[in-house]
């Protein structure tokens, strides 16, 4: 019986020959039988792949045979069976596209100058100790935060990761420079960079949630400071940490709570938006708010 699994991981470490690592990763993934997205750069590797549990384990074993990746923090989750339509392995200038390659220095120890890493338990201790002085700062895009976020979190106005530099330089968050900022994202990689960019701009007390929302959910589920669902970058689109998770997202058609994203039916758009199963099943127009007047 097939048991589908998905793994998420990243490693910041200098790679002298990203093209060679790309070819090795392509061969390893194909040989193991996994699909997903793998990004390689001079800064390291960032990947989300899935498949049958035996295939995924074979991939992880092969990955850790390469010394720079042997200590990769592998985050496991349940898959649905066909979570990735294909395998993509690419070389890019940055592991995460902040458009700031010259502002980031990576050594064999990771990203230099980033925020202090905190485990989920240490985050709770910080909140207990400093109360309202602690501010959660979302390192994801607005779309992702619609269905789930930390309670009271600041969610920057971003459509892509490239928008963060513009947002930070706008001065809109300067009033938080004396706060204890806890940055968070899905698995932790975006906050490795974002926390450093914040510190470079005068934010003095910056932290990052080690392992991201995924590790927090494993530790506390829906019993802690997290509310809602977690947006994920595969065919599932979202995952929950318990059956009692409360959805924060709202269907654009009827306003009911839903974590369900669909693509706009307008072929010139295809933007993701929230639409519940009832509205989709009832044949309601599955177009985003911007495209409702546009014929599909």
Curated annotation (Swiss-Prot):
Q: Name the residues annotated as catalytic in the UniProt entry.
A: 185 (cysteine persulfide intermediate)
- GO BP terms in the entry: tRNA modification
**What EC number(s) is this enzyme filed under?**
1.14.-.-
Q: Which SUPFAM superfamilies match?
A: Rhodanese/Cell cycle control phosphatase
Coiled coil regions, renumbered to chain: none
**Which segments constitute the Rhodanese domain?**
130-225
Per its record, the protein catalyses:
uridine(34) in tRNA + AH2 + O2 = 5-hydroxyuridine(34) in tRNA + A + H2O
Q: Keyword tRNA processing: yes or no?
A: yes
**Annotated SMART domains:** RHOD
Root EC class = oxidoreductase
Recorded GO molecular functions are:
oxidoreductase activity, acting on paired donors, with incorporation or reduction of molecular oxygen
Q: Which UniProt keywords apply?
A: Oxidoreductase, tRNA processing
Q: Which family does it belong to?
A: Belongs to the TrhO family.
NCBIfam families assigned to the protein according to its UniProt record, in alphabetical order:
PRK00142.1-2
PANTHER family per record: THIOSULFATE SULFURTRANSFERASE/RHODANESE-LIKE DOMAIN-CONTAINING PROTEIN 2, THIOSULFATE SULFURTRANSFERASE_RHODANESE-LIKE DOMAIN-CONTAINING PROTEIN 2
Task: State what this protein does.
Answer: Catalyzes oxygen-dependent 5-hydroxyuridine (ho5U) modification at position 34 in tRNAs.
> This chain belongs to which protein, by name?
tRNA uridine(34) hydroxylase
- The species this protein belongs to is Kocuria rhizophila (strain ATCC 9341 / DSM 348 / NBRC 103217 / DC2201)
- What's the source species' lineage? Bacteria, Bacillati, Actinomycetota, Actinomycetes, Micrococcales
């Amino acid at each position: 019986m097939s048991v589908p699994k998905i793994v998420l991981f990243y490693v910041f470490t200098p790679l002298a020959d990203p093209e060679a690592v790309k070819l090795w990763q392509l061969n390893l993934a194909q040989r193991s039988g996994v699909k997903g997205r793998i990004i390689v750069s001079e800064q390291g590797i960032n990947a989300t792949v899935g498949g049958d549990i035996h295939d995924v384990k074979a991939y992880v074993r092969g990955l850790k045979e390469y010394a720079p990746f042997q200590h990769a923090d592998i985050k496991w989750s349940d898959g649905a069976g066909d979570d990735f339509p294909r395998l993509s392995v690419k070389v890019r200038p940055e592991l995460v596209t902040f458009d700031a390659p010259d502002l980031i220095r990576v050594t064999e120890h990771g990203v230099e100058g980033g925020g202090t890493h905190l485990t989920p338990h240490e985050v709770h201790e910080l909140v207990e100790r400093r109360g309202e002085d602690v501010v959660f700062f979302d390192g994801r895009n607005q779309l992702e935060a619609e269905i789930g976020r930390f309670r009271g979190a600041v969610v920057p106005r971003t459509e892509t990761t490239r928008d963060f530099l513009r947002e930070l330089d706008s001065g809109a968050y300067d009033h938080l420079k004396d706060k204890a900022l806890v940055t968070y994202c899905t698995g932790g990689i975006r906050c490795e960079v974002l926390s450093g960019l914040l510190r470079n701009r005068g934010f003095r007390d910056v932290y990052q949630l080690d392992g991201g929302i995924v590790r927090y959910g494993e530790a506390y589920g829906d019993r802690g400071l997290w509310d809602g669902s977690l947006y994920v970058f595969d065919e599932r689109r979202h995952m929950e940490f318990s059956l009692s998770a409360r959805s924060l997202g709202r269907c654009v058609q009827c306003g009911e709570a839903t974590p369900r994203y669909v693509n706009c039916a307008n072929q010139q758009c295809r933007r993701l938006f929230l639409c519940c199963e009832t509205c989709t099943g009832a044949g309601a127009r599955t177009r985003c708010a911007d495209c409702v007047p546009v014929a599909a």
